[in-house]
């Protein structure tokens, strides 16, 4: 794997970190601050989670843990259901959807502080609303995941473990 980017720091500010591989082939950042180590981990977890759903779905994650997930006929209703599960945990979290983010969704979601919003696309009206939040990271998920993303790698003493993802 080639180094793609040196990160400001790792999971904690005293840790050095770098990103290796083709992460940025899978996502396009439209706005916001530079991605952190923790953002990249959360984006990965969010992307795997949302890939399990066909209907319009919203998932809210914090530290890779889903704190609200719902599917419905549209993203606004799905958001209301996902957010209702825990109205405090989403603060500073990651929001991922599997449909285009439109004005109605952007207006509702922009009322809380989020670190990252991931979607297949955003309408111009949604981008204008989110554009007022300069630090909010907006990410477009560029279609399907590469085949090497379907494997999990864990470091262990003296080596690595590699396994297929549990789909």
Each language-model region and where it sits:
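ATP-dependent carboxylate/acyl-activation modules
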Residues: 1-167
């Amino acid at each position: 794997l080639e180094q793609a980017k040196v990160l400001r720091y790792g999971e904690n500010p005293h840790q050095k970190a770098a990103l290796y591989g083709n992460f940025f082939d899978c996502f396009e950042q439209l706005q916001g601050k530079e991605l952190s180590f923790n953002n990249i981990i959360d984006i990965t977890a969010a992307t795997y989670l949302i890939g399990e759903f066909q209907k319009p779905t919203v998932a809210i994650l914090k530290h890779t843990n889903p704190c609200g997930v719902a599917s419905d006929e549209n993203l606004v209703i799905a958001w209301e259901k996902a957010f209702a599960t825990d109205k405090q945990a989403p603060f500073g979290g990651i929001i991922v959807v599997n449909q285009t983010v439109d004005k109605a969704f952007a207006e509702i979601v922009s009322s809380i502080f989020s670190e990252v919003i991931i979607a297949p696309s955003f309408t111009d009206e949604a981008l204008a609303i989110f554009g007022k939040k300069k630090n909010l990271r907006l990410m477009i998920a560029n279609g399907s995941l590469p085949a090497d993303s379907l494997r999990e790698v864990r470091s262990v003493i003296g080596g690595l473990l590699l396994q297929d993802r549990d789909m």
